[in-house]
Amino acid sequence: MLVDAFKDLPEIVSICKRSPRNGMMVIGGGVPRNTVQSAALASKKGMDYAVIMTMDRPEIGGLSGSTLEETVSWGKVKSAANKIMVIGDAMIVFPIIVASVLERLGEDFKRAPYLKPKGIGGI
């Protein structure tokens, strides 16, 4: 597997530009978090919502623990965005969040039409 954030960035920026609202859910941090946040900045829109789950703490200087207030100051997340930073183990926290979201969405949940993959029935 080859991971190349520079090749992914134009596609992510394009998705951000076409989407009526943008958000991110980041588990951990590092390059994936920075790539998504940079796409929001490049699209000149900023994120409308953000969830960051990390074990890193801003007090000790861990980059993955940089606060959402910092991302707002860069324009990567809108100041009025719904945002939360969860300090905890993703192996515990993530399944609980997913179960809660799926329960709230119910049977009416549908993928945004502009994000549906082509050729597989929109699943």
Name what the model sees in each region.
Residues 1-27:
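Active-site rim loops that border cofactor/substrate pockets in soluble metabolic enzymes
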Residues 21, 31-32, 38-123:
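C-terminal functional extensions of proteins
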